[in-house]
């Protein structure tokens, strides 16, 4: 289920408006306290009414809209979805779901109540005592009431729903998503109401008043102009879909923490003496074979994606290819053409088709500067059945994928050594993005472990990568194969990997003979247990302390992968100007390309952070053969990580000092950029949580641990390597870094644990080195810098002495100098 916007408070949007046409003197229900009078049908639904039959009969009489609810639909649950269909230019995009809620209508005398329904608390036995207890204790919120205006044939009831839409009920409102304070009913109009057999679709033009705060949808970095401040009006197109939940609920499938899946959870009460359990089921599409006995069968109903009408024609073949890539995984479990991607039908083919109809899964192309895409879904809260999963592709994701491909792998692909990339290559990158987002709409979350399961050798192998790509799941953020080197011939773009086939089998594979979710458990456990022998089938969420669960990384050795990636960055810088600067034009593209390349360099270096003090999670269940689920990163790898930083980052990277490039678009700032890249990593290396893990590792395995003392010594030695020279010279970039080292370690003196005492010892040791080196420095800048460092260290060690107080002499601590 999509997250709902925050509830409306007193005096907020819609305050004072009658809810559902009931409350308030003189409202549709008549004077306060007066019972509503049920009129003859013809007086309410006049001969001039425009009516449409479907889930409910809908009627328009002048400017009022009525629903005629059949008696057999009272008490039935329906899904109500609100979508931002159109938006002003400054909001970037529409076609975004903002609310969804399960509701039901029930009759109470001459009124109809609209209740919000949840399925978060249930009983194991629907006919048992616990179910009766829950029913006695449970009450569902009444979010609106309606007077019954008239009744029709077969006890149908007619209610006025006009104010549901123009009155901005909080439960269905878009105001929180657009940063508005309230809706203005006088500037809000219902455009159309259509009723279909399973759903009702309502479109309206709604005007809100700005000032609600928050972050409006689509307003992200670089996403178009700001809102017109000369008016407080925000006019949008809204779309409400009311959809009948399946008459035959799909059999749910139980989740397993070892297999990543979007899921729906509820609390379940069992017998009187049993504890309350949390039951988690997969969010997945209903997929059933036409011929259950056939090894390969088409589904009764394929998962169908429609290509939105706004998708540029030249990109549609690539989008379709990206969608249908998943068919290979479904064929492995016996489904032929499980996924279908097609154009939306023409009016001649299907005059009733509406791509905004929530019954249809439509890939939308959003005219936005947001460099992203996402794959949302809406599910039946009773069973997890996915009812809609419409991927959203922002137009500027093309720019993002172009820049990433150029920065990461252009040395391995001559086509990419000139910007912009050729159309066919851009199409291949778009297909990859679509495949990833469609995976989300099938129920799969990000698997951040997948990019770390291939070895460096495998990533450089043409044969391996042609078969599996560069990560074991396309649902990771592994991106393009920056580990591959020129001449390797390896595949550069991700594809479906072993984990994707495995996860689809777990979620969609048929289990013959199973009648209940519990019946499926033995077979599902057998599938999940295959992870024991095959690490490529393992799942993991992103973790800052686990080097195998990072974002945007590749390979089972972060240090070596980064070393190889930096070689490719160096190669890109060799042809950056030629690739990005076009004769006769300004340097905007060059500046963007440079920033992308530098950003990629920083990202690859950050992957190594998790190695230091890192813990690797196995996420296996009891009996799978592992003794523990968490294992420290070996000390040798941690030491190698710090060595990489000393060599490739703390020694001033020559690649970042390129005035021949940067002065084409920026007069200064090189020194600041170098320091920013260094200080972020330095701060991360000595963060308290990392130091506490390292101290604990040392306590548990003192002979084999990489200790906090080791880390501090390695950093001090690397960052102050000039101090051992006979005539030390410290350049501008290193002076900046060394000052940052002192202030960073000074900041640790107020921390807790071993980090505090060892930071103090490190500064005392450093003070002695700096004092000795200051007398040997030849150039004025270095001498001034070293004397300034002495003062800064004294300030950190004992501010009283530095300020002229009566404290102990600086450095008078029980540590060697």
Where do the language-model regions lie?
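Short conserved micro-motifs at the rims of enzyme active sites and ligand-binding pockets
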Residues: 79, 126, 317, 402-403, ...
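Sec/Tat signal peptide C-region and signal peptidase I cleavage site
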Residues: 2-7
């Amino acid at each position: 289920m999509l997250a709902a916007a925050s509830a409306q408070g007193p005096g907020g949007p819609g305050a004072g408006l009658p809810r559902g046409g009931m409350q308030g003197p003189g409202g549709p229900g008549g004077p306060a306290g007066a019972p509503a009078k049920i009129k003859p049908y013809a007086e309410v639904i006049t001969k001039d009414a425009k009516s449409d039959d479907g889930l409910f009969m809908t009627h328009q009489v002048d400017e009022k809209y009525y629903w005629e609810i059949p008696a057999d639909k009272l008490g039935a649950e329906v899904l109500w979805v609100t979508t931002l269909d159109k938006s002003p230019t400054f909001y970037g995009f529409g076609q975004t779901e903002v609310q969804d809620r399960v509701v039901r209508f029930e009759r109470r005398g001459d009124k109809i109540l609209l209740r919000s329904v949840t399925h978060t608390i249930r009983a194991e036995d629907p006919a048992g005592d616990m179910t009766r207890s829950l029913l006695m204790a449970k009450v569902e919120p009444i979010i609106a009431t309606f007077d019954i205006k008239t009744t029709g044939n077969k006890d149908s009831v007619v209610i006025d729903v006009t104010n549901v839409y123009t009155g901005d009920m909080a439960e269905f409102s878009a105001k929180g998503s657009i940063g508005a304070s309230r809706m203005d009913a006088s500037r809000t109009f219902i455009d159309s109401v259509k009723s279909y057999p399973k759903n009702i679709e309502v479109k309206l033009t709604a005007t809100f008043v700005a000032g609600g705060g928050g972050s409006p949808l689509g307003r992200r970095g670089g996403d178009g102009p700001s809102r017109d401040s000369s008016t407080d009006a925000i006019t949008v197109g809204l779309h409400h879909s009311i959809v009948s939940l399946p008459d035959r609920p799909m059999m749910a499938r139980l989740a397993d923490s070892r297999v990543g899946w979007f899921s729906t959870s509820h609390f379940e009460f069992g017998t009187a003496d049993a504890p309350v359990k949390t039951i988690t089921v997969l969010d997945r599409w209903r997929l059933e074979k036409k011929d259950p006995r056939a090894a390969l069968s088409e589904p009764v109903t394929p998962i169908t994606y429609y290509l939105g009408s706004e998708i540029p024609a030249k990109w549609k073949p690539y989008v379709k290819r990206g969608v249908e890539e998943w068919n290979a995984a479904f064929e492995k479990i016996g489904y032929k053409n499980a996924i279908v991607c097609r154009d939306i039908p023409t009016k001649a083919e299907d005059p009733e088709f509406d791509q905004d109809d929530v019954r249809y899964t439509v890939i939308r192309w959003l005219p936005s500067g947001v460099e992203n895409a996402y794959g949302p879904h809406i599910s039946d809260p009773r069973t997890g059945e996915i009812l809609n999963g419409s991927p959203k592709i922002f137009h500027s994701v093309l720019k993002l994928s172009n820049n990433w491909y150029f920065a990461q792998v252009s040395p391995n692909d001559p086509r990419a050594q000139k910007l912009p990339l050729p159309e066919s290559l851009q199409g291949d990158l778009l297909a990859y993005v679509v495949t990833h987002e469609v995976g989300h709409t099938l129920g799969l979350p990000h698997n951040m472990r997948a990019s770390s399961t291939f070895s460096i050798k495998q990533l450089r192998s043409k044969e391996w990568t042609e078969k599996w790509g560069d990560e074991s799941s396309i649902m990771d953020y592994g991106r393009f194969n920056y580990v591959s080197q020129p001449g390797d011939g390896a595949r550069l773009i991700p594809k479906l990997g072993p984990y994707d086939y495995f996860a689809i089998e777990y979620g969609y594979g048929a289990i013959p003979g199973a009648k209940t979710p519990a019946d499926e458990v033995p077979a599902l456990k057998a599938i999940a247990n295959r992870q024991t022998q095959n690490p490529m089938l393992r799942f993991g969420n992103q973790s800052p302390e686990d080097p195998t669960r990072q974002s945007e990384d590749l390979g089972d050795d972060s240090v070596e992968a980064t070393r190889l990636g930096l070689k490719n960055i160096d190669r890109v810088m060799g042809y950056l100007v030629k690739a990005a600067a076009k004769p006769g034009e300004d340097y905007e593209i060059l500046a963007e390309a440079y920033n992308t390349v530098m950003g990629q360099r920083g990202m690859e270096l950050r992957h190594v952070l998790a190695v230091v003090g890192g813990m690797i999670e196995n996420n296996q269940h009891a009996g799978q053969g592992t003794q523990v689920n968490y294992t420290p990163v070996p000390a040798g790898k941690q030491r190698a990580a710090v060595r990489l930083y000393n060599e490739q980052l703390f020694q001033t990277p020559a690649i970042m000092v390129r005035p021949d490039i940067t002065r084409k678009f920026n007069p200064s700032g090189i020194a600041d950029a170098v320091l920013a890249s260094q200080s972020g990593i330095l701060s991360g290396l000595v963060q308290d949580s990392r130091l506490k893990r390292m101290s604990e590792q040392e306590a548990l395995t003192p002979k084999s641990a990489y200790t906090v003392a080791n880390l501090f010594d390695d950093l001090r030695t690397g960052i102050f390597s000039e101090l051992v020279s006979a005539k030390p010279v410290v350049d501008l970039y290193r002076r900046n870094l060394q000052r940052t080292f002192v202030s960073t370690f000074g900041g640790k003196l107020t921390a807790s644990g071993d980090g505090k005492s060892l930071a103090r010892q490190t500064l005392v040791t450093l003070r002695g080195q700096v004092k000795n080196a200051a007398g040997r420095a030849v150039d004025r800048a270095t001498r001034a810098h070293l004397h300034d460092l002495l003062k800064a260290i004294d300030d950190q060690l004992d501010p009283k002495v530095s300020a002229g107080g009566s404290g102990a002499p600086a450095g008078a601590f029980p540590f060697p100098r």
